[in-house]
Amino acid sequence: MKKAMWWFAVLTLLSVPAAPQVKTNPLFIIQRSKNANVVHYDAQLTADGKLDPKEPVIAYWVMLAKDGRREELNWIEKKKAYGFDIKPDPSGNGYRMTVVAYPKREITVRQQGDAVRAELVIDGRPAVLEKMYINASDGPTGPNVHYIELYGKDLQTGRKRFQKIVPK
């Protein structure tokens, strides 16, 4: 009887389909002057290595000011600051993304072969976005952004690109 139960358990486990494998590919990060915690944006790939059409990009915290663990963005962070809107590019070549707190700058998430990258115009040139840095202080009605820095690499030359944006 025990042997029959053991085989039943093994066969039951083998008959359950495995969850689809989801891989991620780092796109860019947002660092802030407030603390060492970093928001990561990753491309989410299906088992065959293509951008996941259901959820092509994910965002989450890496809590470096604490113990380095990963945490999800909370509702307010998603709706007011670090969340994003994403939709398929009309050309069919990737996705168009805007970070909620800065919708003026559109980011294109594009896949070429195995590589996935976030493309953005930095200082007038198309570039691969690597990092944003936000210098801000706490104000009475929320954060007061002093400036934003964009860091990346020129798409054509591979040289480093930088732009400092001071809100008006």
Predicted regions span which residues?
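Sec-dependent N-terminal signal peptides
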Residues: 3-17
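N-terminal export/targeting and maturation segments
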Residues: 19-75
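Short, solvent-exposed mixed-charge patches
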Residues: 21, 167-168
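Beta-sandwich interaction modules
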Residues: 126-139
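Short, exposed beta-strand-loop hairpins at the edges of beta-sheets
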Residues: 138-163
